[in-house]
């Protein structure tokens, strides 16, 4: 993923990662950032990064709040036949990351992250993918509503994929 230090948001850092990878006994492939510095304000140079060896664009771990930036990223990625991968959660609705907003978080008085913080972003990006015809992957999906949104977007013709991890679907209340 692009969430390295430094962030893979330019050709020099990408080349550094690729060169370091060549010194290992395994194949190392790299993602590149969607936005410069993971700030969600300005796109990286997708063409330069693709030509440099990036295989996907993502601001992994950081949600992209700007709908216009996401749409622009999808349009550019579609032009280059490159996938995008999104971390879907709206920070405005999250009181405490890492715990579901529900009975347990309320009992412990620690806030939490409601499912709507995820599925509202999933809905937005699925519909933008449908409109732009971009290929997107929803990272570590965790709510049934999000799964249904992806399923619906796919039925409508969007090129949307999703992944999850055991802790995102098995640790429930």
Task: Enumerate the predicted regions with their spans.
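Conserved residues at the C-terminal ends of beta-strands
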Residues: 1-2, 34, 60
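Histidine/acidic residue-rich metal-binding segments in metalloenzymes
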Residues: 41-173
